[in-house]
Amino acid sequence: MPLLVTSASGANGDGYGALLAFDDGGKPLGPFSDDDRIVDPRGLAPDPERRLLFLNSAERVLALDPAGEVARDSGVIAGLNPGGGIFGPDGRYYVGLRGARTVLALPPDLKRPGEHVLPPGVVPFPRGFGFGANGKLFLSSGIGPDGKGDDTIVAFSADRTRAVRLVDDPELSPLDLAVAPNGNVVVSSEHPFGALGAVTTVREYDPESGRLARVLSASGLAAFRRPRGLRFGADGNLYCAAQDEVVAFDFKAGRCLGPVVRLTRLHGQALAFFP
């Protein structure tokens, strides 16, 4: 199954500004789609039921078919400025909004307007989010391009009426968040954010107490600079997009397996296995 990675361009990274495909051995296959609506792409999430890949691109959301053709297009959504994207338990497609600093839920047909599921400005700078089995929404809050932020994870109740600061970890600066198969919250971290000598890790937290359960590091097996998007594979491994590579971790054993993709100037933002 091909591995797809969004590569940032412009002010956010000297990358390719494209959705790139790699084969099972990590060999680059070029852009998955040449559609000119794909501009400096960010989050992406597969919809296995419909065999579509949802992709956040500039001021719109696209859904691509297995051939890389655009099957659905939200049209321009003014001020979207999207970050990550995932499907929620209600079947809607959720998008992190970096400018509005909230999360938007869109219907999967992309034909109707979405709605904010959290108040605008709910965190200083959203960096990634995920849903727990009980409907909780976990939102990582990191440092923005202006250097401001609060480096934590906020947990919202299933009805979104209550919020608690879940994590107090002085060594955390989150870049993306995923909920692991064991229910724990997993975050890619670069601390201090943007620093030349930043410590890069994957950090795992208990979803109820916020207790730090484990810290995964590259252990010299990968450069692991500027870690960003996280994704669990069907093999149970955890994959993380980074500056010049995609790094795999044996999540059960808690050890790094090294890069599965190497590409100079990748500036990986998000990844998915599709179709």
Where are these regions (language model features)?
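Conserved beta-strand element within WD40/beta-propeller blades
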Residues: V5, F54-L55, V95-G96, L139, ...
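A short loop-to-beta-strand structural motif that recurs across blades of beta-propeller domains
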Residues: G17-L20, R60-L62, R101-A105, D151-A155, ...
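Short loop/turn segments immediately following the C-termini of beta-strands
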Residues: A8-G10, N56-A58, R98-G99, G142-G144, ...
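Short loop/turn segments that connect beta-strands within beta-propeller blades
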Residues: D23-K27, L64-E69, L106-K111, F156-T161, ...
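An edge-strand/N-cap motif at the start of beta-rich repeat modules
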Residues: M1-G30
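Blade-level signature of beta-propeller repeat domains, shared across WD40, Kelch, NHL, RCC1
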Residues: Q243-P275
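Beta-rich, blade/repeat-based domains predominating
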Residues: D14-Y16, D35-R50, A58, I77-Y93, ...
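A short beta-strand motif characteristic of beta-propeller blades
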Residues: K27-D36, E69-V76, R112-P120, R162-D168, ...
